[in-house]
Amino acid sequence: MSEKKNCKNSSTNNNQTQDPSRNELQVPRSFVDRVVQDERDVQSQSSSTINTLLTLLDCLADYIMERVGLEASNNGSMRNTSQDREREVDNNREPHSAESDVTRFLFDEMPKSRKND
């Protein structure tokens, strides 16, 4: 029976060492290193995932804005016929450009600030 106790004690001593001056239990350094490395890997993966999602969101927003601009440009050019341009020139005004129509459309569609309410 004492052999079994010695066996248990020796296996415990192999896995964990005690500092005789403090009498505290210390974990082997390799275990601590693995835990710290695992935490770094998880943080790195999380950071990488967030960066990927932000990049995807940015590209998607650019694509949407491009499509909205094209749609607004197409709608504006349909309304802005050659007869309209002739009338504007006859009235000594500058002809409408599709860019100004797109810009006006985009700003009209933007949500208004709540500070003014």
Curated annotation (Swiss-Prot):
Basic and acidic residues bias: start-end ranges: 82-117
Start and end residues of each stretch annotated as Disordered: 1-30, 71-117
InterPro entries linked: Histone-fold
GO cellular component terms, A-Z: nucleosome; nucleus
SUPFAM superfamilies hit by this protein: Histone-fold
Biased composition (Polar residues): 72-81
Name of this chain's protein: Huntingtin-interacting protein M
Organism field: Homo sapiens (Human)
Gene designation per UniProt: H2AP
